[in-house]
Amino acid sequence: MDWMPLVLAAEEAESRGFSLNLNLLETNIINIAIVFGLLIFLARGYFGRVLGERKSEIENGIREVENRGRQAEQELATARQNLSQAQVQAQQILASARTNAERVRAQVLDQAQIDIARVRETVDQDLRNEQQRILTQVRLKVVGDALARLRERLPGELDEATQRRLLDRSIQLLD
């Protein structure tokens, strides 16, 4: 590299009041300090603003996540409470259904007993009626047969005096 043009430019600038120090040990430390100082001074506001915005975004994100977490916890608590109430209600419905089923079963059994008793009574009444009808038929048959035999025997055995006595006795029995 050719240092000569730089040296000439530095000498000319020095003659006018501004000069470059070409001593590498002195210039690097001073230049670095100046650049760092300017960088810190100028960039502090920009980086402070950028970092502040980023910090604000992160804080807002954290608050939003915390709010959603609290809301989720509240919804979970509500859901658990609803589940508990639903379980209690289901147990009540089940108990009520069992009670109703037992009551209906008892009513059906009672009604069946009543119906069985009614059928037995009807059967007994029908049997008594049938027995009565058969007895009546037997009596009528016996009386009919007796009358038929009597009619066969009476004309020869019954004279007028016997007929009067029978009539008188029958009249007395009616009084």
UniProtKB/Swiss-Prot annotation:
PANTHER family in the cross-refs: ATP SYNTHASE SUBUNIT B, CHLOROPLASTIC
Protein family according to the UniProt entry: Belongs to the ATPase B chain family.
Transmembrane helix is among the record's keywords: yes
Assigned keywords, A-Z: ATP synthesis, Cell inner membrane, Cell membrane, CF(0), Hydrogen ion transport, Ion transport, Membrane, Transmembrane, Transmembrane helix, Transport
Any Gene Ontology CC annotation: plasma membrane
Species: Gloeobacter violaceus (strain ATCC 29082 / PCC 7421)
Membrane protein topology class: Single-pass membrane protein
Recorded name of the encoding gene: atpF
Protein name: ATP synthase subunit b
SUPFAM superfamilies xref list: F1F0 ATP synthase subunit B, membrane domain (SSF81573)
